[in-house]
């Protein structure tokens, strides 16, 4: 039986997530499968992978061929690194304890790189939010200044309209007094 490790699609339109399954290569994509070894959700950032490491390693060791995407997932999770190290142990290049130490060192290095990437993304988000807030403050200051100028112009126009009316009122009173005399 030609066994494949591949993705089985689930989810709604434009929002797919996948099960990582062991299936016969002749079976339909979403059809019959031998074993489910994990899930893959590419919609999150970074993509979420939940994988049964031991079963994935077992199937790779017995010769199951992964699809391109699954090969990348298994490589990122360390299944292929572990297979490589177990091959070195089988050849007698080094011991199993040394292989475990190398694998743990590789895994820790991978985790530190991932955490640094997440921290960098978080810092970029904070900087972007701060820049957006500063830009909004500047726009609000310009709007407030324009509004204050408009109110000052209205007050000046209102004061100018009242001043001639006040000057005209005493002149009218004087004219009425002169006519009365």
From Swiss-Prot:
The keyword Ribonucleoprotein applies. Residues 150-181 are annotated as: Disordered. Pfam families: Ribosomal_S16. The keyword Lipoprotein does not apply. GO terms for biological process: translation. GO terms for cellular component: cytoplasm; small ribosomal subunit. InterPro entries: Ribosomal_bS16, Ribosomal_bS16_dom_sf. Coiled coil: none annotated. Transmembrane segments: none annotated. One of its GO terms (molecular function) is structural constituent of ribosome. SUPFAM superfamilies: Ribosomal protein S16. Residues 158-181 have a biased composition (Low complexity). Keywords: Ribonucleoprotein, Ribosomal protein. Belongs to the bacterial ribosomal protein bS16 family. This is Small ribosomal subunit protein bS16. The lineage of its organism: Bacteria, Pseudomonadati, Bacteroidota, Bacteroidia, Bacteroidales. The gene is rpsP.
């Amino acid at each position: 039986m030609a066994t494949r490790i591949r993705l089985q699609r689930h989810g709604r339109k434009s929002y797919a997530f996948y099960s990582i399954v062991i299936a016969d290569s002749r079976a339909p994509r979403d059809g019959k499968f031998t074993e489910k070894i994990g899930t893959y959700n590419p919609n999150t950032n970074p993509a979420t992978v939940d994988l049964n490491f031991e079963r994935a390693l077992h199937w790779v060791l017995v010769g199951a061929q992964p699809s391109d995407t699954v090969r990348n997932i298994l490589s990122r999770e360390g299944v292929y690194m572990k297979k490589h190290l177990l091959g070195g142990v089988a050849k007698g290049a080094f011991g199993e304890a040394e292989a475990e130490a190398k694998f743990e060192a590789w895994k820790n290095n991978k985790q530190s790189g991932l955490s640094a990437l997440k921290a960098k993304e978080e810092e970029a988000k904070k900087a972007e939010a701060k820049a957006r807030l500063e830009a909004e403050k500047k726009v609000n200051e310009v709007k407030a200044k324009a509004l204050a100028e408009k109110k000052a112009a209205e007050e000046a126009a209102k004061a100018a309209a009242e001043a001639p009316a006040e000057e005209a009122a005493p002149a009218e009173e004087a004219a009425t007094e002169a006519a009365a005399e």
